[in-house]
Amino acid sequence: MRRILWTAVLCAWLAAVPAGRAAAQTAAAEPAKAADITPEAKAPVEAMCAFLAGKKTFTFSVEINEEQVYPSGQTVQLTRFADVAVKRPDKLYSRVTGDERDREMVYDGKTVTMADYDRGVYAVVDAPPTIDAAMEMLADKYGIVAPLSDLLYADPCKTLLTNVRTGDCVGVHTAGGAVCDHLAFTQKNADWQLWVEKDKTPLPRKVVITDKNVMGWPQYAAVFSDWNMTPKLPADLFTFKPGKELRRIELKPLAEGPAAQGGGHE
């Protein structure tokens, strides 16, 4: 699992996130080592990856509950909601709202636009011609992670299982209103769980990550809903039109210092 959740979206240029989580998401891959994943865990996750990989267009919603640990040691939980639309190979849309968050990301095959409505700003960067390449560029160049990006790649398992050390099936449990295979995986800096629907549509229904890099081991939980594998998407969904309330800013690569600076250009 490399970048499965929304935690770091826009954080490099608009808002801070817990240092341990950000470091975990941008760290280099661990040295290659054969993962100890049982067949009972491997089969459901591979079925899910194959199912998602075979879909050119789909949408889903997510409820995200994230624990944050304050310097005092106190833990608080924030709740957010995300709507995501994918049109392979070169279109991606997401909108996240909720506690301390109102953000939008639009990828049209040529550029990625990221807007923060709370702060009244947006940025546009040139992007490669595929979703996979665009997400890699954002992560490597800007430290920005697309929402639930592991599940959006053309081959989800290629990134989802990166750095996994062990994997097992906990049992058959319910998540998101569906009967699922409940899977548990470990990595050096995180434990994570995945609920995959036991059906002809092996969709991810829930993800929970425990961050072992941060004091108190905070958790990040995402429950999926409203999967639509044959959506009729609006023609203008992947065209960003900034409102008058938004001011364009410059997004600078990580190597150039501060990620964002205010700008007056349109």
Task: Show the residue positions of the predicted features.
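Gly/Pro-enriched, hydrophobic low-complexity segments
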Residues: 39, 63, 113-114, 123, ...
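An acidic-aromatic
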Residues: 25, 85-147, 213-220
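Bacterial N-terminal signal peptides
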Residues: 7-17
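Signal peptide processing junction and immediate N-terminal pro/mature segment
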Residues: 17-29
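Positively charged n-region of N-terminal signal peptides that target proteins for export
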Residues: 1-4
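Flexible, processing/modification-adjacent segments and terminal tails
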Residues: 26-46, 53, 115-180, 185, ...
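N-terminal mature ectodomain segment of secretory-pathway/periplasmic proteins
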Residues: 30, 36-121
